[in-house]
């Protein structure tokens, strides 16, 4: 996907977006139908209130506002039932429950009166209705005129729950969403700041790898998404409408954060930046195809939700073919993740300290997303679903980010730290399939962020990759009368030179040669690259060469 695909996709989605039927709704309806749906709202059991303003030509009299609730004998029994006509749909209404508002001057509670505009008579109705029920319920508002010549209505409705800023314009299934989003925003800001601090430490140690940068990017996008959600819901709390474009952008960023994090997990499972420096060409193609497919299904999911979801039904995002396709892709990603981790552990068993908790923690995460979607579709009551799903979804994202932040913290006490190869070593690899040397963890060498560890600088790596002290002196070339010292793991220890011609430190000087002239050239220690890239420098000496 090219660099301009992101803005283009955003404009496409915004173009598909329809104006949301918010808790303040207005419109102008003209249709040949005799029964139509207007809007829905989830009222509290005691504080629900509908304020309305209706106006229509007196010649179109008489029209009715019908109030259905979510009982199986009410709204589900009439909506999209082609075998029922207008009268049958009105018959399920219980007049004793005041579920009918007759828009005429004869019905006092409708507040209707005849007005004149441009020589034409109109019925203008301004009034309200309170709602009482045994629990929170979805209420559906419809307009009818059975046996007439169609419907015509100019309407304006305000649906509220109490007078508090946190509840007034919110449907009962949305209670707590704004507070929840604000709380998680603050938590994710803390996670982002901690990840930036850890990234600064890792950069100083040349351990700030691409996968950790992806984690920081995912956390940053998550923060931006939650910020936009808070802006949307805050504006919605004030006017009951909100800015739907901000909500769509927030959803896009939320999905982008999820996709970045998912890609990072698959890359880490394959050992990228932990046991290998690059992904093979075939692996890169597979990842590109998979992420493209996942992005397309997410896009289709957004378009389907915005364009094809029926506002007269309470639907969840994943209640669509694209939603179930997303769940299937999530399971496919988990299978890929399992295979990648097992292969990595097979070749690098010393990385079990990282990969075992990593695999266990994110197995729960991989299953949490589709299980949440299935429970939301079939197990949570519709009048409470949106607020519950919002909290669970944010909790799942928080779990994923918090676990990664903990297991990758750059602390000497962290035995799960995954990185041991410096970023400067990855860039000089010659083959894309070349693996890192077998080494447990570079984290055990963390002593200071700013001062080099001189002891490790002059240590010699053993065959298993760990640093070992020098037990035998390395015979540097010496000449007559030259005292020489040998470095060991204790930088202050001086070792006497070996026996030279049977006399310690003494050798005959050839005739005609001064002591100074007999000195042979000493060569600086050279750093030799072995197979892979050892973490520490080692000292090697060159043989004596004549002047």
Swiss-Prot record:
Main location: membrane
UniProt cross-references to Pfam families, sorted A to Z: GPR180-TMEM145_TM, TMEM145_N
Transmembrane intervals: 2-22, 182-202, 214-234, 248-268, 283-303, 325-345, 356-376, 388-408
Claim: Signal is one of the keywords in the record: no
InterPro entries: GPR180-like_N (IPR053880), GPR180/TMEM145 (IPR047831), GPR180/TMEM145_TM (IPR019336)
Any one GO cellular component localisation term in the record: membrane
Cellular compartment(s): Membrane
Mode of membrane association: Multi-pass membrane protein
Protein name, entry field: Transmembrane protein 145
Organism: Xenopus laevis
Gene: tmem145
């Amino acid at each position: 996907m090219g660099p301009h695909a992101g803005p283009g996709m955003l404009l496409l989605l915004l173009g598909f977006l329809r104006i949301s039927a918010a808790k303040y709704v207005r419109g102008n309806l003209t249709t040949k139908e005799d029964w139509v749906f207007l809007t829905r709202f989830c009222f509290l059991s005691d504080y629900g209130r509908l304020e309305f303003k209706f106006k229509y030509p007196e010649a179109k009299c008489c029209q009715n506002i019908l109030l259905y609730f979510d009982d199986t004998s009410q709204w589900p029994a009439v909506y999209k039932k082609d075998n029922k006509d207008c009268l049958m749909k009105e018959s399920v209404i219980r007049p004793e429950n005041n579920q009918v508002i007759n828009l005429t001057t004869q019905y006092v509670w409708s507040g209707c009166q005849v007005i004149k505009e441009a020589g034409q008579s109109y019925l203008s109705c301004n009034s309200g209705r309170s709602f009482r029920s045994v629990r929170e319920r979805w209420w559906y508002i419809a307009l009818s005129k059975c046996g007439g010549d169609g419907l015509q209505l100019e309407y304006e409705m305000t649906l509220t729950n109490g007078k508090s800023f946190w509840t007034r314009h919110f449907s009962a299934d949305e209670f707590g969403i704004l507070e929840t989003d604000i709380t998680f925003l603050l938590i994710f800001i803390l996670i982002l700041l901690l990840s930036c601090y850890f990234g600064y430490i890792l950069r100083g140690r040349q351990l700030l790898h691409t996968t950790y940068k992806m984690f920081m990017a995912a956390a940053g996008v998550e923060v931006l998404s939650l910020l936009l959600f808070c802006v949307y819901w805050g504006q919605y709390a004030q006017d009951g409408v909100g800015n739907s474009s901000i909500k769509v952008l927030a959803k896009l960023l939320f999905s982008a954060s999820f996709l970045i994090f998912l890609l990072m997990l698959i890359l880490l499972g394959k050992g990228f930046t932990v046991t290998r420096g690059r992904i093979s060409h075939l692996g890169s193609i597979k990842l590109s195809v998979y992420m493209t497919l996942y992005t397309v299904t997410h896009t289709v999911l957004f378009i389907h939700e915005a364009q094809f979801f029926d506002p007269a039904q309470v639907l969840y995002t994943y209640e669509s073919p694209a939603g179930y396709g997303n769940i299937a892709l999530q399971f496919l990603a988990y299978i890929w993740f399992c295979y990648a981790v097992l292969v990595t552990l097979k070749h690098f068993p010393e990385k079990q300290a990282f990969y075992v908790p990593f695999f266990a923690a994110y197995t729960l995460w991989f299953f949490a997303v589709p299980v949440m979607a299935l429970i939301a579709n079939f197990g949570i009551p519709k009048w409470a679903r949106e607020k519950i799903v919002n909290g669970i979804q944010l909790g799942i994202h928080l779990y994923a980010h918090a676990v990664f932040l903990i297991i990758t913290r750059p602390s000497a006490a962290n035995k799960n730290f995954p990185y041991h190869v410096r970023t400067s070593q990855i860039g000089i690899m010659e083959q894309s399939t070349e693996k890192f040397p077998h080494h447990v963890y570079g984290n055990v060498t963390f002593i200071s962020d700013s001062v080099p560890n001189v002891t490790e600088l002059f240590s010699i790596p053993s065959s298993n990759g760990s640093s070992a002290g020098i037990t035998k002196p390395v015979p540097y070339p010496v000449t007559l009368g030259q005292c020489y010292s040998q470095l060991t793991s204790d930088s202050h220890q001086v070792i006497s030179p070996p026996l030279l011609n049977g006399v310690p430190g003494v050798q005959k000087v050839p005739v005609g040669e001064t002591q100074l002239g007999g000195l042979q050239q000493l060569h600086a220690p050279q750093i030799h690259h072995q197979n892979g890239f050892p973490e520490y420098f080692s000292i090697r000496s060159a043989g004596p060469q004549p002047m």
